[in-house]
Amino acid sequence: MKNKEKLRPFDEPLFCAIGKHRPEIMEDFTRVLLNDDSIKFKDSAVNIIPASITPDNKQTAEFIAYTKNDTVICFITDSQNEEEMINKVKWYRASRIKEYAGEDLDSIQSMILVILMEKDAFGYERPFYVMDSKLEYSDKTVIFRYKQIYVNSEYGFDDPLGDYIHDFMCDDIDDMRIDSIKEAVKYFESIGE
């Protein structure tokens, strides 16, 4: 992130930079999102995949963390409408999940795919939407079940989740609500990342 560029997750992903340098912030965001204080990331079990282009020429970015109970939590961004979003998630799911688990999906206890949405794609004004999903392999009898959580970045309430969503979307350090994110962004700017 350069000083003159806006710190928005759909341009240069702030949550990826935070995940790389300050994974404890993303760990706390995950606890707030899932309402589960027991969430703990494994040490050095964080993977940042730089912004990439999907088959429909849209940019996405990824942050992957592994919890101590072997849950994989993947964060991606999306600024598209619902239909394009669903198509991208299908592409992402097919191209990435097997890569994390190798040939053995049993090595993953569970998986949560968190999609940070620029708009409220479903239109119900909720902070997030949870869907149960599954991945089936036609050549095997394997069915891998996981959760998809669509986070509504237009959610503007003054609660812990709203504070995180606000700061991930914010391009003004002085307007950020969470001190640890402010400090992280100031650090990123000081090193020119």
Annotate each PLM feature.
Residues 1-193:
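Elongated, amphipathic alpha-helical interaction scaffolds
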